[in-house]
Design a protein with these regions (language model features):
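Long, charge-rich, low-complexity alpha-helical segments
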Residues: 1, 21, 336-387
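Active-site region of the double-stranded beta-helix
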Residues: 1-17, 30-182, 190-232, 236-237
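Short acidic (Asp/Glu) and glycine-rich catalytic loops that position anionic groups and cofactors
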Residues: 22-23, 196-199, 229-239, 324-326, ...
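Short coil/turn segments at secondary-structure boundaries
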Residues: 57-59, 271-274, 361
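C-terminal amphipathic alpha-helical segment
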Residues: 224-298
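Acidic, low-complexity/disordered tracts enriched in E/D and polar residues
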Residues: 265-349, 374, 385-387
Length: 387
């Protein structure tokens, strides 16, 4: 993991003193780091219709954004400095990049959102900004300078005239220069500004952090189909001198009690949160199997050497509660028996199989496991490994 090469800091120290609190530079955290793709291959992805990409052009105190997809010829006209290509969710298109997530496995996998990859020409940068999520910045080819400033929030003044959210008043108080294999952790809300010293690649591991409105929307969506219809508003004691059209304080208190009662439902909270955090970022990549298999057919295929891995767009999470194992996958929830030893082991394998082939040998003779596996395969959540 990222901290394995740093005797000066261990995982408990990082989690207690740095995570979501203050930045940390990890020099040579990934010794011998080799890029997963070339700048040309990244540009090729940016030419694809289904890939989210943009180019940011920068001159002193001025930025311009152009959104993809791009034509190949557009890259031939770019200068050798002062621009940055950013491509979202590259881990979905280049599954090998998911091996980076093994280096941050001390944070639950359902917190990871995606890996964005950027190529910056010399002097290229996207301006001072802040994110609402934590990020690990992994330097690949080249070198990049990062300046860090104060912590920001929703009230921080922004300049949005360029289409970017540029900080209007950025005063750096820390400066780091990252070389290949260096990693910089930046907590959510901390202002930062990157600029390429030498043209190169940066891998940004971002973490999903839904706001309260998203959490409430997810809860409400599930509650619509779950809460009983007779849980309704009722008047408090109506005063004889009540004024027509007035909403009284006692009425608001009655509504508050009703809403608090509706929210005090751990079952709904668990399911809505688990489904929200496993919603796929690119659901269009989750395509059902061309030929659906029966449990018996899957067993035969596995015995003949068929190998499966998680679809690069799949997201998994789980929660053990009482006799039930709540198994979340791509915004869906399955409740499995919690006392089933093999299912529990299969769940562990699925939750930890980031960027690798699943080891399904221990589960081939178990009917419950095969039933789950064939459903995941037919849904397109698991795919056949083509290596």
């Amino acid at each position: 993991m990222l901290l394995d090469n740093h005797d000066s800091i261990d995982l408990p120290t990082f989690l207690s003193e740095y995570w979501q609190k203050k930045p940390l530079l990890l020099k040579n955290a990934l010794p011998g780091f080799i890029d997963f793709l070339s700048p040309e291959e990244l540009a090729g992805l940016a030419c694809e219709e289904s890939v989210e990409s943009r180019i940011v052009f920068n001159t002193p105190n001025k930025w311009e954004v152009k959104n993809g997809p791009f034509a190949e010829r557009e890259f031939t006209f770019l200068s050798e400095q002062d621009w940055t290509l950013l491509v979202q969710s590259v881990d979905h298109w280049v599954p090998e990049i998911k091996s980076l997530l093994q280096d941050t496995a001390f944070i639950p996998s359902w917190r990871v959102d995606d890996v964005m990859v950027s190529y910056a020409a010399q002097g290229g940068g996207v301006g001072p900004h802040f994110d609402y999520y934590d990020v690990f910045l992994v330097q690949g080819l080249g070198s990049r300078q990062w300046q860090l400033g104060k912590t920001c929030n929703s009230k921080t003044p922004l300049n949005t005239s360029s289409g970017l959210k540029i900080l209007g008043d950025f005063i750096p108080d820390q400066t780091f220069e990252l070389q290949t294999g260096d990693v910089l952790y930046v907590p959510a809300g901390m202002s930062h500004c990157g600029k390429a010293v030498e043209a190169g690649l940066c891998y940004s591991i971002g973490f999903r952090a839904p706001d309260v409105a998203e959490l409430l929307a997810a809860y409400s969506h599930l509650a619509n189909d779950t809460l009983p219809a007779d849980l309704r508003y009722r008047d408090p004691v109506v005063e004889a001198d009540a004024k027509p059209g007035e909403i009284s304080s006692s009425t608001l208190q009655q509504v508050k009690v009703l809403m608090q009662h509706a929210l005090d439902n751990e079952e709904l909270l668990l399911q809505s949160f688990g489904c929200l955090m496993t919603e796929p970022r690119l659901p269009e990549l989750l395509v059902t199997a061309e030929v659906e298999l029966s449990p018996e057919q899957l067993i035969v295929h596995l015995q003949k050497g068929m190998q499966l891995s998680c679809n690069s767009a799949s997201r998994f999470a789980c929660h053990h509660r009482g006799d039930g194992l709540y198994f979340f996958v791509n915004g869906e929830c399955l409740v499995l028996p919690n006392d089933h030893e093999k299912l529990a082991a299969l769940n562990t394998e699925l939750q930890s199989a980031v960027g690798r082939t699943l080891n399904l040998t221990p589960f081939q003779r178990n009917k419950s496991c095969i039933k789950l596996l064939v459903w995941l395969y037919n849904q397109g959540y698991l795919v056949e490994t083509t290596e």
